[in-house]
Design a protein with these regions (language model features):
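Conserved alpha-helix/loop element of class I SAM-dependent methyltransferases that forms part
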Residues: 27-61
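Short alpha-helix
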Residues: 202-225
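A short acidic, Gly/Pro-enriched loop at the edge of an enzyme's catalytic core
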Residues: 116-128
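Class I SAM-dependent methyltransferase SAM/SAH-binding core
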Residues: 61-118
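Core SAM-dependent methyltransferase catalytic element
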Residues: 218-220, 234-251
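A short glycine-rich, Lys/Arg-flanked "PGG" loop and its adjoining helix->strand segment in the class I
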Residues: 142-157
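A short SAM/SAH-binding and catalytic strip from SAM-dependent methyltransferases
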Residues: 127-142
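Conserved class I S-adenosyl-L-methionine
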Residues: 157-190
Length: 251
């Protein structure tokens, strides 16, 4: 039986983590203690930290980390007094969450699930959903935003990190434009070969219309946005944005 692209991506990310992938390295005990003392930052996108005012007071808030495993953000939110749930499809990312929780002696609900399916939560379950860059690993993003709207409480906040597609147009050195958009290896054999050669799993470009428009169509009101770069490489050096972070509210 052929593996789904979601399974291929989970296995790819597990392998990257074993090789030292930066987004799979859990925070240190010192970083956790600093957060408890009010000194903290978290990332939705590679470089620019999320403004603290996007969150408000996190004490006793119910937060879902959506495709947010790795032991990087959830421990910070716990340190700030939140009740956290993390959902991811990578075993290694979830193992990191469990490791930090055991080390720091706190409770967190850890769920392995595919976010392209109906999310395993009741309506109106969460105050905040924290969704860092990850939807580039799924083909259709609009259903995810609809599910986020369903499971957020009225007045709840959706925080997203979004790849806006620039990365999928250029070669590895980021010197030449080699691809048209959309980038979809499920329908474009040449794009699939590119990903295979670079061990990049199965990735997809998504437009602003899909991602921000998708949030608006789901019922959200956009309240703030900022852009960001890759953090390295030629596009970064030229200050060409590859990501946006968004804050939206369920009214």
């Amino acid at each position: 039986m052929l593996k789904s692209y979601q399974e291929i991506n989970a296995e790819t990310i597990d392998r990257w983590i074993e090789e030292g992938w930066e987004w799979g390295q859990p925070i240190s005990h010192e970083t956790y203690l600093n957060a408890k003392n009010g000194n903290w930052n978290v990332l939705l996108t590679p470089v620019n930290p999320v403004p603290h005012e996007w969150f408000g007071n996190l004490k006793d808030k119910k937060i879902l980390g959506l495709a947010s495993g790795g032991g990087q953000q959830m421990p910070i939110f716990v340190a700030l007094g939140a009740n956290c749930t993390v959902l991811d499809y990578s075993d290694k990312q979830l193992e990191a969450e469990k490791m930090v929780a055991e080390r720091e002696k706190y409770e967190i609900e850890i769920i392995k699930a595919d976010m392209t399916k109906k999310l395993p939560f009741a309506d109106n379950s969460f105050d905040i959903i924290f969704h860092p860059v990850s939807n580039s690993y799924i083909e259709k993003v609009e259903p995810v935003f609809k599910e986020c709207y369903r499971i957020l409480k009225k007045g709840g906040i959706l925080l997203c990190g979004l790849d806006i597609g620039t990365n999928y147009t250029v070669d590895e050195k980021e010197e030449k434009i080699i691809n048209s958009l959309p980038f979809n290896p499920l329908v474009n054999e040449e794009q699939r070969k590119q990903l295979e050669e670079q061990d990049c799993g199965i990735q997809f470009s998504h437009t602003i219309s899909e991602q921000i428009g998708g949030q608006l169509k789901a019922g959200f009101r956009l309240t703030d946005i900022y852009d960001d770069t890759n953090g390295f490489g030629r596009l970064h050096e030229l200050n060409i944005a590859s990501f946006v972070a968004t804050r939206a509210i369920k009214e």
